[in-house]
């Protein structure tokens, strides 16, 4: 998908009766953006302030963990809605070419390919995918001069009167924003000050804590969040149940799933390394089946969400009735359903047993190892 800026965005502004034009008509920013960091944002913001229109192109071959095509597109379109954004991988480029009627689609040059291969590829994307030429390219690298020369030559082959492309170099020594994508990928949490909250959220490991009623999952989520200096996501279903005095209807199940998802998205931006989720849409799916014998297709989709870690609290201590719960037999039924459902979905999980202190220790060991036991 090509995300096009809203009509009129970034155009010349009117002050009284006179139009105040920016120095360039169309600017270009190209990068892997793996991930998008403050240095990249500085370059893009400078381009937006100096150009009537800005094109942002992102590709990488190979891709990097947490920085897939869809994620990079989300970062860029949310952060810079007034730019035209093209984020591609080979599959996406092939789809675009087919849609535009090209018989063959080029493949992305490898990250280690010669500079001129990348420059000609970008020129082709500008002209044939975006239908644009540019008069400025913004970078923070010295190679930008050669980039501008190749773009000029490529554009003038097709549009002889295309203006020469000027290179605008911003903070080449990275003194203003001393960071690189490589450094962030190696240590995203130590370098989070160079990432916007929305980008950092993509590196947060989401920990899903499941368990039957009165199995200690809420206490565990709170305790883990406090231990790691992070945040936890409360169970929205319980809040809605209390608000409606226990009188839930089938449509409430989808609302619960959506709200739980939305809370995770919002709180991930405030998390530190881990986000502890007191339940997931999988629990809502269970209650939808148990209470109404039906599950909305969208809720089934929400229940497919991937978590970095899944922990299941065993029902191995006394059942505490707080007025909202059923009984120990239902708790056992729910636990058995989780075990079966997680197995059928091939989801690895850590079974937490014993006291709160013992469960906390087991959870910490799991997070330290980075995998279920």
Question: Model regions: which residues?
Answer:
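A glycine- and Lys/Arg-enriched "phosphate-lid" helix/loop adjacent to the NTP-binding pocket
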Residues: 292-358, 362-364
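Conserved substrate/cofactor phosphate-moiety recognition/catalytic segment
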Residues: 222, 226-265
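P-loop (Walker A) phosphate-binding loop of NTP-binding proteins
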Residues: 212
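Conserved nucleotide-sensing/catalytic segment adjacent to the nucleotide-binding pocket
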Residues: 247-291
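Nucleotidyltransferase catalytic core that binds NTPs
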Residues: 1-205
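Hydrophobic anchor at the beta1->P-loop junction of P-loop NTPases
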Residues: 209
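Conserved lysine of the Walker
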Residues: 217
């Amino acid at each position: 998908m090509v995300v096009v800026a809203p009509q009129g965005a970034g155009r010349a502004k009117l002050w009284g009766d006179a139009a105040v034009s920016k120095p360039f008509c169309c600017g270009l920013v190209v990068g892997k953006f793996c991930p998008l960091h403050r240095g990249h944002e500085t370059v893009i913001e400078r381009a937006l302030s100096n150009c009537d229109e800005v094109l942002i192109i992102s590709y990488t071959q190979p891709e990097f963990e947490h920085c897939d095509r869809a994620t990079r597109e989300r970062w860029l379109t949310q952060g810079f809605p007034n730019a035209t954004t093209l984020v591609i991988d080979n599959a996406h480029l092939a789809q675009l070419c087919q849609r535009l009627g090209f018989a063959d689609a080029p493949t992305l040059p490898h990250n280690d390919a010669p500079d001129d291969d990348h420059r000609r590829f970008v020129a082709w994307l500008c002209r044939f995918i975006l239908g644009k030429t540019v008069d400025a390219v913004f970078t923070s690298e010295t190679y930008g001069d050669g980039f501008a020369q190749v773009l000029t030559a490529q554009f003038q082959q097709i549009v002889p009167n295309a203006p020469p492309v000027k290179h605008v170099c911003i903070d080449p020594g990275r003194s203003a924003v001393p960071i690189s994508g490589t450094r962030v990928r190696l240590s995203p949490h130590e370098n989070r000050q160079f990432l916007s909250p929305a980008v950092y959220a993509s590196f947060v490991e989401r920990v899903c804590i499941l368990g039957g009623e009165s199995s200690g999952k809420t206490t565990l989520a709170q305790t883990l969040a406090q231990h790691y200096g992070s945040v936890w996501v409360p169970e929205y279903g319980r809040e809605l149940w209390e608000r409606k005095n226990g009188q839930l209807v089938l449509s409430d199940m989808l609302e619960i799933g959506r709200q739980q998802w939305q809370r995770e998205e919002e709180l991930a931006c405030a998390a530190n390394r881990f986000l502890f989720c007191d339940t997931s849409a999988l629990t809502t799916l269970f209650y939808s089946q148990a209470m109404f014998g039906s599950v909305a297709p969208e809720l089934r989709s929400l229940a497919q969400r991937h978590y970095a870690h899944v922990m299941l609290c065993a029902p191995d201590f006394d059942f505490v009735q707080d007025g909202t719960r059923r009984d120990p037999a239902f708790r056992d039924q729910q636990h058995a359903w989780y075990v079966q459902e997680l197995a059928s979905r091939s989801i690895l999980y850590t079974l937490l047993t014993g006291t709160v202190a013992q469960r906390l220790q087991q959870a910490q060991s799991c997070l330290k190892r980075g995998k279920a036991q």
